[in-house]
Amino acid sequence: MPLHVEVRGSGPPIVLLHGFTQTGRLWGSFGERLQGDYALVAPDLPGHSGSEAVRADLPTAAELVAEAVHATIGKEPCVLLGYSLGARLGLHTLLGTDLSVRRVVLIGGTGGIDDAAERERRRQTDEAMAAELENAGDIGVAAFLDRWLAGPLFARLPRSAAGRDERRRNCASGLASSLRLCGTGTQEPLWGRLQALTVPVLALAGSDDNRFGIHALRIAACAPNAVASLVPGGGHAVHLAQPDHAWRLVDHWLRA
């Protein structure tokens, strides 16, 4: 089953891969700024919104992304920009598909969890959240989103920028599937493969997002053409909370 894709704007293509509980439309004013200069190719990822019936792990989702992009823009080289879940999926797309990518932006990204015991603990946490979603059904999605967005990852994200209405387009079964199949606990660690990347990579994170700031620096150390940039005072969803600052960093790097 193909992914649902929307294209907005015109110009060189940027493929946008959203985060967990989001949709291809949820890029806020950051996306609007990009749309002024680029064609935004924005799929709904497996288990989300228009792709809610799609069930796929990260390697399979990467193939679906490549197929969707090829069906939309052909073989034209693109910029690949992913946030959180989308950043992890972006790495799988780079390493496991034939998508022609000229530059990559990873916001709040990671190469995965190295330690097997920690990875299993994360898998169990994701499974518990998936079961919670399934037990509550679609009527419980709003309450789940409130708890999700109240977590420490999003402490810096203003309520007005969180996109709750757009997130509510998701269904319980789709989100549960995403947690089970694409959660960090089920992801193969990719750190040892990043040295094979030759495409330029910008790893972006908020300076107050300690864990993912460390991941950004590690990505820059592992991939030969990667650089890291930390947005002062930024949290995990830095492109939504500080869209102008994030856009300036990304735009400057894309034009360099």
Language-model regions, residue ranges each:
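Conserved HGGG/HGGXW glycine-rich cap/lid loop of the alpha/beta-hydrolase fold
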Residues: 3-52
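Active-site loop/oxyanion-hole signature of alpha/beta-hydrolase fold enzymes
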Residues: 28-32, 41-81, 248-251
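Gly/Ala-rich beta-loop-alpha elbow adjacent to hydrolase catalytic centers
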Residues: 82-86, 90
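Conserved alpha/beta-hydrolase "acid-adjacent" motif
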Residues: 210-215
